Amino acid sequence: MKRICIAAGGTGGHIYPALALAQSAMEQDPDTRILFIGNADRMEARIVPEAGFDFAALDTHGLEGSLLDKVKAAISLMRAIPKAGAILDEFRPDIVVGFGGYVSAPVLRAAHARHIPVMMHEQNSIAGKANKVTAGCADEIVTCYEKAGEQFPAGKVKLLGNPRGSVAASAAGDRQVLESLGLDPSKKIILVMMGSLGSTTMNDIMQQVLDRPVEGLQFLFVTGRGNEDAGRAFEGRPDVKVVPYVDTLAIYPFISGMICRAGATTIAELTARGIPAILVPSPYVAGNHQFYNASVLKDAGAAQLVEEKTLLENPEVLRDTIRGFFGSPMILESAAKNAARLGKPQAAADMLQDMRILCGGSR
């Protein structure tokens, strides 16, 4: 398995797990050739080359909007199939791995038509549209939740997890980062982070929730770049440190819990490390995926779920949840164990093993 083609695009939830798998493949065999296929005008066109991987672009659009928009999108997807085929013919991959996003659909269809082994990865508990329509092209479908597996042909599904969990599980942390932030490692640290870009709505809510100290807890409040003003209310507070961005891998080993969104990558990292969390799903994502992701952890006793609309009506609900959840050592320990039971820290290695088998190799 020397040549791998990875199709992923649109959002970080598709792209970062794909990059994690690619990096693991290179660690196992530095001579591996990897080609990413994505959209020319989406974030993958910047992120993938910056990570050091080759990138080829297609022009595809999602099936959203008006009827005319959907027709145009369908035409773009059909036109992308022969172009994807030409890219595959030139690169000659041993296997194609699709991580979702509409751009993956024409790539998987082109690979299937050429009898190239295909692995599909579904990050969420509710399958994405692109993966649903191309499931028939896949030889193996990797899921992160049992519920997701129920939406695909049973004989193709394997519950292996998200490669980002492998990255998080192996993170050693950086105590210097902790010290530079002025956090006390002898006290519980709660990371508050609403995705890489932050959330102005949740920033406003957190200012109300943390307007006074919570006994026994200190908070690292990540506002997102461009939202630094949200931290001014906490100037001089030793229990709340505010930054626009933090490398989560550097601080995961030192935190006792998180208050965060419920994107697929975040969930994979939390469970791989056994970090208990209060999850506030983003209500702005397609298919309400984050709510269903969060529900899985809540039902497993690994997290608390609080909806944003509830907090808009009464922010004190979150403060009460913080005190009851993070303030109880017994509840926190139980949630951490339950989160770890859901984790798949070997996801990347397990996927690579199965990829070799699909290519006709052995474990």
Which functions belong to the PLM regions below?
Residues 331-345:
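A short, well-ordered alpha-helix in the C-terminal region of glycosyltransferases
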Residues 3-9, 31-76, 85, 160-162, ...:
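Conserved nucleotide-sugar phosphate-binding/catalytic loop shared by glycosyltransferases and other
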Residues 344-363:
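C-terminal alpha-helical cap of glycosyltransferases
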Residues 93-95, 241, 253-268, 275-276:
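Acidic donor-binding loop of glycosyltransferase active sites
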Residues 26, 83-96, 104-119, 132-140:
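Glycosyltransferases and closely related glycan-assembly transferases
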Residues 43, 112-175:
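Active-site-proximal region of nucleotide-activated glycan assembly enzymes
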Residues 304-330:
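C-terminal "capping" alpha-helix adjacent to the active site of nucleotide-linked donor transferases
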Residues 42, 47, 51, 174-258, ...:
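Donor-nucleotide binding loops and adjacent catalytic segments primarily
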